[in-house]
């Protein structure tokens, strides 16, 4: 692959399309302990937690003292703790001054101004080169989709992810290695935000060029949708066995998609809408944190869980990127917007509230899906993937479905596959 092509955005070995048994991993049986353990006892953690308690408790004088101290100690260009403190401090300031809406709007506008196809591509490439944070879910999803749609002459993938199609070059490569005639692939990708129109156009052109190189008949459709993914017109995007799908085997790919839906019944409605599409498979990849408003009713608990999750994320970036990396800064600025939303935004409208593997599994099961175990072949591909990166990464199997990516023994990403459950027997 040419180094200047977007098709190089996913350089992992494509998963084997052959079927195999499900693979076995160590099980994490007590997620509550792992997820809710306090972050390491650094000065940043202690001061931020105390400041959050002062803000939520109305102790204005103490909150102001702590904010002044945190401002002196923090820096968006310092070490992990200084960077993290800077972003959480800004969110606490926005909360205390009731300026969350304007702060989120300003951060979003700044992100749009700095986003281009080249900057998006460069950040994605570099992040995948140095960390499995994204590629882990890509490899798991690709392998599961390839196996679920094996033998189908016409494949339709509805990609609801926010990863700018970076997982599909290796999927195209894997299709090209299959024996017999290459199947026709239709990729429908959903993009959010007006600033992404040009990015989507560039991505589509490069994917079409790469598909021609691989000898894969390929159709690409970009759908632009701002706001809640649950409000998409799913039937028009790809309705399983209906005319909208043209009889294709349908796969729905959700990488960091579901937590973009406001928590509660909206997420249940989203899962139910996916079930009505009658797909062969739905892949769900989500970052792991228990930030549901119904479970994080008090601000202190929600703040501590947000701090725990982003401490792990920033720590992984610290050990993967140079301190002055532009790509690292871009990833951290995106995290800053998420932190602002979680700390200062309205929980009922938040698009950043992650869940646990158990809670996502419960939603999928309630919507009429059954877990689809990842095969030995996919497990082998994931194991090989982690060997490419520095020490500290591992994986384990959570109950009841999927597999975890762990950073320093802490679950950070969950990858899973689901199939429609058979209808209940008639009474």
Label each residue range with its predicted role.
Residues 1-427:
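Long, compositionally biased intrinsically disordered terminal regions
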């Amino acid at each position: 692959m040419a180094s200047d092509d977007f098709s190089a955005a996913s350089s992992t070995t494509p998963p084997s399309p052959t079927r195999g048994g499900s693979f076995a991993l160590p099980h994490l049986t007590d997620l509550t302990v792992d997820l809710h353990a306090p972050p390491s006892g650094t000065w940043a953690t202690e001061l931020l937690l105390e400041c959050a308690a002062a803000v939520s408790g109305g102790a204005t004088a103490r909150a102001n003292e702590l904010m002044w101290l945190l401002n002196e100690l923090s820096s968006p260009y310092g070490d992990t703790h200084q960077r993290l403190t800077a972003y959480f401090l800004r969110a606490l300031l926005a909360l205390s001054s009731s300026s969350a809406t304007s702060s989120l709007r300003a951060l979003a506008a700044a992100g749009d101004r700095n986003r281009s196809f080249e900057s998006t591509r460069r950040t994605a490439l570099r992040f995948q080169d140095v960390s499995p944070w994204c590629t882990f879910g890509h490899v798991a999803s690709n392998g599961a989709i390839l196996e679920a749609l094996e033998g189908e002459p016409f494949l339709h993938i509805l990609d609801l992810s926010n990863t700018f199609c970076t997982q599909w070059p290796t999927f195209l490569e894997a299709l090209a290695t299959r024996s017999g005639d290459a199947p026709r692939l239709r990729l429908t990708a959903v993009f959010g935000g007006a600033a992404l129109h040009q990015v989507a156009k560039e991505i589509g052109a490069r994917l079409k060029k790469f598909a021609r190189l691989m000898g894969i008949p390929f159709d690409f459709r970009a759908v632009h949708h701002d706001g809640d993914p649950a409000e998409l017109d799913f039937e028009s995007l790809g309705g399983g066995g209906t005319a909208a799908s043209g009889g294709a085997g349908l796969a729905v790919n959700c990488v960091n998609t579901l937590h973009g839906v406001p928590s509660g019944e909206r997420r249940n409605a989203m899962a139910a809408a996916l079930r009505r599409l009658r797909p062969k498979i739905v892949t769900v990849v989500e970052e792991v944190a228990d930030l549901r408003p119904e479970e994080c009713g008090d601000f202190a608990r929600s703040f501590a869980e947000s701090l725990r999750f982003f401490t792990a994320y920033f720590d992984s970036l610290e050990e993967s990127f140079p301190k002055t990396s532009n790509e690292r800064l871009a990833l951290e600025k995106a995290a800053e917007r998420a932190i602002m939303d979680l700390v200062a935004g309205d929980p009922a409208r938040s698009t950043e509230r992650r869940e646990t593997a158990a809670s996502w599994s419960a939603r999928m099961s309630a919507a009429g899906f059954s877990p689809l175990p990842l095969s030995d072949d996919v497990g082998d591909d994931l194991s090989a993937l982690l060997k490419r990166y520095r020490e500290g990464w591992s994986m384990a199997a959570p109950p009841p479905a999927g597999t975890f990516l762990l950073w320093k023994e802490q679950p950070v990403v969950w990858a899973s596959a689901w199939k429609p459950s058979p209808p209940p027997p008639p009474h």
